[in-house]
């Protein structure tokens, strides 16, 4: 099941992070950061896992993933809003819209149909609502928690909390452990997924605390592109024209945002 797979991946990932990025003693973390950041981190992961699990078809799973990938756009806009620069949101909006269209093309490809998507949302709205809520929560998390952290990175702690939450959801939903033990390749798949996801979150957490948030927000558009690329390579599927058009739009949207912002900065200097 979806929850079992996610729980296994996050359990292994949490163990890896405990070894590689051992957290500071809990008592040293700011309480507000632990509470607000921890709740948002766990809610995001729980919402996304449940949203994908509640999707009734493969098409709905794709559409739910697209809704989830609104988080880079929301992050760009929120970062602009919290930058306290006059008109920053309006300057970020054109590039954000172009990049979002690019993400939709790159991830959805030729299989994405707006009319079908609207029908699916009406017939099964919960996974779409959860995916959008998750995207919104993650954008808020990335925007507001660095200022609460006092330099502490709670990624490892939050990741382990997600693993516990997913196990609770799995057993409460009436699902038990599998009757048959996974194959060797099953264990390899879990470990590989855990390594990539935990590594990605570790890098993201470090970037939030030590990098430029505006640059990180723009760079986040690469996440769905890289995810789609790796998936198609693993499945041996050729990348079609919509993907490459989408990539061009993502790059163009990001460059437009940078150009408009630099132009505005020159005029105000």
Where are the predicted features?
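Specific transmembrane alpha-helical segments of multi-pass solute transporters/efflux pumps
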Residues: 23-62, 67, 105, 193-211
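Juxtamembrane helix-entry segments on the extracytoplasmic side of multipass membrane proteins
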Residues: 1-7, 26-31, 108-135, 172-191, ...
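Hydrophobic transmembrane alpha-helices of multi-pass small-molecule transport proteins
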Residues: 11-12, 17, 36, 41, ...
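Loop-to-transmembrane alpha-helix entry segments
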Residues: 27-32, 62-68, 83-105, 125-127, ...
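Transmembrane alpha-helical segments that form core, pore/gating elements
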Residues: 2, 13-18, 72-79, 114-176, ...
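Hydrophobic/aromatic residues within transmembrane alpha-helices
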Residues: 5, 51, 81-84, 148, ...
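Hydrophobic/small/kink-forming positions within alpha-helical transmembrane segments
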Residues: 11, 18, 38-42, 46, ...
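Specific alpha-helical transmembrane segments that line the substrate/conduction pathway
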Residues: 4-14, 53-86, 213-232
């Amino acid at each position: 099941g979806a929850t079992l797979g996610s729980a296994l991946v996050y359990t292994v990932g949490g163990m890896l992070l405990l070894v590689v990025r051992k957290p500071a003693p809990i008592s040293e973390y700011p309480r507000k950061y632990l509470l607000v950041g921890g709740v948002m981190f766990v809610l995001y992961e729980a919402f996304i896992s449940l949203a994908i699990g509640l999707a009734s078809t493969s098409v709905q799973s794709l559409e739910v993933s697209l809704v989830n990938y609104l988080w880079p756009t929301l992050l760009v806009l929120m970062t602009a809003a919290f930058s306290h620069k006059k008109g920053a949101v309006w300057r970020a909006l054109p590039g954000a819209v172009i990049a979002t269209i690019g993400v939709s093309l790159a991830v959805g490809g030729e299989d994405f149909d707006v009319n079908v998507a609207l029908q699916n949302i009406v017939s099964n709205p919960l996974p779409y609502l959860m995916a959008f809520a998750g995207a919104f929560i993650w954008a808020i998390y990335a925007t507001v928690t660095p200022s609460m952290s006092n330099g502490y990175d709670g990624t490892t702690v939050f990741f382990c909390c997600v693993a516990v939450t997913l196990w609770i959801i799995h057993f409460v939903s009436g699902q038990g452990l599998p009757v048959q033990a996974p194959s060797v390749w099953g264990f390899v798949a879990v470990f590989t997924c855990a390594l990539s996801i935990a590594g990605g979150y570790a890098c993201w957490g470090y970037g939030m605390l030590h990098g430029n948030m505006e640059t990180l927000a723009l760079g986040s558009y690469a996440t769905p592109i890289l995810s789609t690329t790796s998936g198609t390579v693993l499945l041996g599927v050729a990348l079609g024209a919509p993907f490459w058009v989408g990539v061009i739009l993502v790059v163009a949207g990001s460059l437009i945002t940078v150009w408009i912002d630099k132009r505005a900065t020159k005029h105000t200097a």
